[in-house]
């Protein structure tokens, strides 16, 4: 019915629209609610560069990512470029918004335009869900969307100003290594108290490395068990079709240094330093044996 669509978009159901569920619909809805991997595999559609709109056929490491997001409150993921990290993350965030009421999700990236692009991918996936699985739409914009189950998703740049005064159930930080150190520190001092006050709130950090900065520190601490983040690392060879020949071709088209950072996920310095980045990397990043304070000279 035309009156049941949101602002003339036939792919969206407006708020407070009644849907007749079949017995099969109810079974599927409950199955999807319990299993975000099944939901993504069966119902998420993505835009492929060559083929247009296609089902999301997940690789094993993408399934593992979604399971980790679902099981753990704090996730930090170090991933090479072009591994479908955005699509994987977006499918989990969409699952969370549909199957949980009255939750707020923040999609934050190093640039506002990147965050809005991620939200756009989520909205494309949402438009291609069957109507019986959709929540009704209250508001639908380039920077946010509100569902009639009370859930809201907003996209912005990673900054304290973007989230100040707001409460989030999930914060997703894309390419967090590319956020300047001082902005990242300011952001966490603003947002962490509200996240840590909940029992089921989540922070998901996904990035390729960029030198030895805040992301390097958080990743290193997660590996050592010094913080609560569960670290997940993906190797470029886990993507089907990427082999030694692909590596050689990519290095030939770019550079070995670029390949090490963007695909091997090495924390090399982003600029030439007096001490070679490979030497800096070999030096252990450990807590000092003793910290002295209040020394007056």
Language model region names:
Residues 1-74:
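Pre-P-loop entry segment of helicase/translocase ATPase cores
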Residues 128, 134, 178-254:
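ASCE P-loop NTPase helicase motor core
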Residues 96-103:
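Post-Walker A helix-loop "phosphate-sensing" segment adjacent to the P-loop in P-loop NTPases
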Residues 121-169:
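Inter-Walker segment of RecA-like/P-loop motor cores
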Residues 72-92:
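Walker A/P-loop
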Residues 174-175:
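Walker B catalytic acidic pair
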Residues 103-122:
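Conserved Walker A/P-loop ATP-binding site and its immediately adjacent core
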Residues 186, 238-294:
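ATPase catalytic-site recognition across NTP-hydrolyzing enzymes
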